[in-house]
Amino acid sequence: MSDPKPAAPFVPPKELKAFPNDRQLCIARFSPCGNFLAAGAMEGTVRRWKVVEKPKPTVDIALPDETAKKPAPKAAKKPEESPVELVPLPHLTGFNGWVQNIAFHPKDKLLFVADTWGKLAATDIEGDAPKPRWENATAHDGWIRKLAISPDGQHLATCGRDQFVRIWTTAGKLVAEHRAEEDVFAVTFAPEGKVVAFGDLKGSITMWDFEAKQLGRKFDASVLHKLSRLQNVAGLRVLTFIDGGKTLLAGGCEPAGGGFVEGAPALLRFDVATGKQLSEWRFGVAKDGFVLDAASHPDGYLVLVTSGQPGSGKIMFLRPGEKEPFFTNTAVANCHSVTLHPDGKRFAVAAMNKASNGNGRQLTKDGQYLGNNSPVHLFEISAA
């Protein structure tokens, strides 16, 4: 028997291009068809792009010139162009505050949007000015902190500052609701689509069978909470199931203190059947902030992003069974969101402009105080 071939060395993902943007973005998502990218912005709009694959350049084969005595001088090397462009489409408007949550329907060309004033809406994604399919301006009393869609596309789950977790049909009809004991910061569907997990201000995570109207197993993520003097500091930001629903991940921050919140990015892994915590990771120190988003790659690893103090951000690849990420990129500042293209070959990160030093920055020559903005960084994952 011949010896097995050694595993190919890991090749880090390659940044193809950073696409500029004039506003800060909270979240970005590729459509399931892969043809669109949408992002929720901090001025009450949804930004849209068409994902355009460039044709591969043709290669000219030069025939030998026997009469040439001297080789032609070498031309300066041109910077490599991105094989993909994000072509801007008109914004979607009619929202308030921050558009912090969006979700695509897994089959229909439909986008669901939630804002920080409590509005929930569904709209088409194609066309210059698509009209909403439906809107609910009072889906929650204030801030909708998280929006999730079931894998079968039948239901939406929302949670908010009003302590409610609500289940809706994707046609906008309220199906079930549960009032938690604290503000709810995250919600996600289990793969079968009939159960959700939600997590609150103090890091208590609960399973809820919304069809049977029954609460189920609880998980202790209280390390993602801190009572700092009179302030409850909430660190939970991300909930997601992996391994076909056998494992639940909870991500966010282990707060170091209140006020100007600092904390270390943290990720917890739980066994769903027993509620037992299996793993716990810290990705830096107090200035590094939060794990703000996670995407599951088909090859079994996670793509995580973090954001902390101005200029502090990480993109990481982590295998759930390992102690450390096998790839870390610190060149992209304050990563708010990550979305994996459906082909698994590319991902996009909504981040922050560099030199985003907040209050105290110098004015421009004409006396303007420039706000921050969120470039969208497009990466290509090398084939193994």
Where are these regions (language model features)?
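WD40-repeat beta-propeller superdomains and closely related acidic/aromatic-rich repeat-like regions
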Residues: 1-384
